[in-house]
Regions:
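Short beta-strand/loop segment that forms part of the nucleotide-sugar
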Residues: 30-39, 61-62, 91
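A conserved acidic beta->alpha catalytic loop
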Residues: 36-45, 65, 95
Length: 245
């Protein structure tokens, strides 16, 4: 199985040179597509250097500015549709997502259309050093989203995922309007509404080792509001799903 892992970057100069070799150390037929939003810390140049070190295995997509997580993924997905890739991965560049978990996710993708790296299934967890309030906020945000959208999934807000290429290609991506972190919720909801089979694999979600987190309380509040917009945007698909039961 040929896999391409998409890694959006913005100021990940400390993390990217460590993550790429870690991914290539896995027993997988894996390539990497870095999507850099003109990082001022030189991440784009580092990505180019990695592409030179690993020719044909690392590709870099340079964008003109900080255009956002959702547009980075959507642009990358579309660029891979004409490729021979079998599966497309999503992961953060900051080691919040343990690269080794991809091995189990690849095993599951044989029988699923989408595999989620899940913090909230048995065996999954969040950083042991997080304070209680942060663990509670993360769990509440996830519970809130999946409850409002009535999805029978345990982790809909996480960003560690593996898609079958055919699944992404069959989805109406032109309808995806979310920006920022709510993008992960919208994509899971759209896949679920369309009836795709979604599996979950337990992961340990670690705090970033290097660099500064881009998550903030403001972003989380905005995401809570936008969950309702996601539900409204796909009410036609939800209606069809209800009729099909």
């Amino acid at each position: 199985m040929h896999i391409v892992v998409v890694i959006p970057t913005y100021n990940e100069a400390e993390n990217l040179p460590k993550l790429v070799p870690a991914l290539f150390a896995l027993p997988l037929n894996l390539d990497i597509l870095v999507v850099d939003d003109n990082s001022p810390d030189g991440t784009g140049q580092i990505a180019d250097d990695l592409a030179a070190t690993y020719p044909k295995r690392v590709r870099v997509m340079h964008r003109t500015g900080k255009l956002g997580l959702s547009s980075a993924y959507l642009q990358a997905f579309r660029s891979l549709f004409e490729n021979t890739v079998d599966a497309i991965g999503q992961m953060d560049a900051d080691f919040s997502h343990d690269p080794s978990a991809l091995v189990e996710m690849v095993k599951r993708i044989d029988t699923c259309d989408l595999v989620l790296g899940s913090r909230y299934v048995p065996g999954g967890s969040t950083d042991i050093y997080w304070p209680i309030w942060r663990k509670a906020l993360s769990a509440w945000g996830n519970f809130y989203a999946r409850s409002i959208l009535r999805m029978p999934l345990r982790d809909v807000t996480g960003g560690f995922r593996l898609w079958r290429r055919e699944t992404l290609q069959a989805m109406p991506l032109e309808r995806v309007k979310a920006s920022g972190y709510i993008f992960t919720v919208e994509m899971a909801y759209l896949a679920w509404c369309l009836g795709f089979k979604i599996g979950e694999v337990p992961i340990y979600f670690a705090d970033r080792r290097w660099g500064k987190s881009k998550m903030s309380f403001k972003i989380q509040v905005e995401a809570a509001v936008r969950v309702w917009q996601v539900m409204w945007a796909y009410r036609d698909l939800q209606h069809k799903k209800s009729l099909a039961r």
